[in-house]
From Swiss-Prot:
SUPFAM superfamilies in the cross-refs: Glucocorticoid receptor-like (DNA-binding domain) (SSF57716), P-loop containing nucleoside triphosphate hydrolases (SSF52540)
A cellular-component GO term for this protein: HslUV protease complex
Record-given protein name: ATP-dependent Clp protease ATP-binding subunit ClpX
Annotated stretches, region: Disordered: 53-75
Domain ClpX-type ZB, chain residue ranges per copy: 1-51
GO molecular function, one term: unfolded protein binding
Binding annotation for Zn(2+): C10, C13, C32, C35
């Protein structure tokens, strides 16, 4: 053993143990005190050239809020009022008036709470009262605008925004993603700025897919249902979470970043297919024994409700019957129901929002010096086809992509064509499974397709 120790040497400079004052051993590697001093000099020179790389603490591998210049915390005067928030949402999202009002008030109160904790409110002696955050649950069919609402809010408030898919989450120790990976996405959107991430918004999509399989507590392990709900509880309520910067499963021995989730606004969304039936069943449940005229009238009234209005009578017990645990529902005190989009709403979505699908394609074609127009009847036909496909606003882009394929393929090569009009006949041909060929160029300045 003594013979082996005599031949120890620095893995970097090659000097033996006898030639240096100190030789520090690591897993299969050695470094001497001289190389350590040299490393320190290199780091000091780099920090002098670029002071923004200075980090708090001794561990420079862990990103902290001091690694970049954080945006200032919101102040009461800088937070848009609920009416202003809704007005901004109106520019991006068509319809869903009730949901937009609920979101506007909830988001305003959340960021007012953050500002209340800052210096601007120190003049008001209200700090004896602790304000708790109110996370939001969005319930609505696919393509009704749940994700878009959350994205638009984050854009308005200029805060980091991350989207997570609840279907990929599992309990710790099982194949899948840990719930802490949700926070990692937000941290990455914040350029690893912890302070900025702690004021962000997280949207968890498909939250209805982690409902437990039955109303009763599960006897066996439900690692992607009730187990995930249990794992999310503390994060939703507010806790100091340890987030692995490279993901927890593949790098188990890395250092963690601590994030306080008490200031992060969580918005959960899901389609909750079948929830209407649960509400309808509760509303129309017959009384035991003889029915009075009052009860008979209420039962008849509940059965006459249109399907899109049934969820307006939603109660927490209905969500429990669907499969969410009471503790999870309690941490989502604000809920908003989004209505299914009808043909008129889909028609408006095609044209009115700032980033409407038709506006996008008009811009694309203008880059080829072609003025693109859509006839009114063509727009109505697109909306009707999207309604028939039952995937909400998401169907609109797919239909227009199909419609524009032949035009976008040939028009860039036909410089003489400066105008192009999309007609109802073109839409009906596409929706009927046919492809309308683009006529060969005849040197006209305007081309009408029919």
């Amino acid at each position: 053993m003594a013979k082996f120790e005599a031949h120890l040497k620095c893995s970097f400079c090659g000097k033996s143990q006898e030639q240096v004052r100190k030789l520090i051993a690591g897993p299969g590697v050695y470094i001497c005190d001289e190389c350590i001093d040299l490393c320190n000099e290199i780091l000091d020179e780099e920090l002098l050239e670029n002071p923004s790389k200075v980090k708090d603490g001794n561990d420079s591998k862990i990103p902290t809020s001091a690694s970049t210049v954080s945006k200032p915390a919101p102040t009461l005067s800088s937070i848009p009022k609920p009416i202003e928030i809704k007005s901004f949402l109106d520019n991006q999202v068509v319809g869903q008036e009730d949901a937009k009002k609920i979101l506007s008030v909830a988001v305003y109160n959340h960021y007012k709470r953050l500002a209340w904790q800052g210096s601007e409110t120190n003049e008001i002696d209200l700090h004896t009262t602790k304000l708790h955050k109110s996370n939001i649950l969005l319930i609505g069919p696919t393509g009704s605008g749940k994700t878009l609402l959350a994205q638009t809010l984050a854009e308005l408030l200029d805060v980091p925004f991350a989207v997570a898919d609840a279907t990929t989450l599992t309990e710790a120790g099982y194949v899948g993603e840990d719930v802490e990976n949700i926070l990692l996405r937000l941290l990455q959107k914040s350029d690893m700025d912890v302070e900025l991430a702690q004021r962000g918004i997280i949207y968890i999509d498909e939250i209805d897919k982690i409902a437990r399989k039955s109303e009763n507590p599960s006897i066996t392990r439900d690692v992607s249902g009730e187990g995930v709900q249990q794992a999310l509880l503390k994060m939703l309520e507010g806790t100091i979470a340890n987030v692995p910067p490279q993901g927890g499963r593949k790098h188990p021995y890395q250092d963690s970043i601590q994030i306080d989730t008490s200031q992060i606004l969580f918005i959960c969304g899901g389609a909750f297919v079948g929830l209407e039936d649960i509400v309808q069943k509760r509303l129309g449940r017959n009384s035991i024994g003889f029915m009075t005229n009052d009860n008979r009238g209420k039962s008849r009234k509940s059965n006459d409700l249109p399907k899109n209005q049934v969820l307006n009578n939603l109660e927490p017990d209905d969500l429990v019957r669907y499969g969410l645990i009471p503790e999870f529902i309690g941490r989502m005190p604000v809920s908003a129901v989004l209505e299914p989009l009808d043909v008129d709403a889909l028609e408006a979505i095609l044209q009115e929002p700032r980033d409407a699908v038709i506006k996008q394609f008009i811009t694309l074609m203008s880059m080829d010096n072609v003025k693109l127009t859509f006839e009114e009847n063509a727009i109505k036909s697109i909306a009707k086809e999207a309604f028939r496909r039952k995937t909400g606003a998401r169907a609109l882009r797919g239909i227009v992509e199909e419609l524009m394929l032949e035009l976008m393929y040939k028009l860039p090569s036909q410089d003489e064509i400066k105008n192009c009009s999309v007609t109802q006949a073109m839409v009906e041909a596409i929706t009927g499974g046919k492809i309308v060929p683009l006529p060969p160029s005849d040197k006209r300045a305007t081309k009408e397709s029919a």
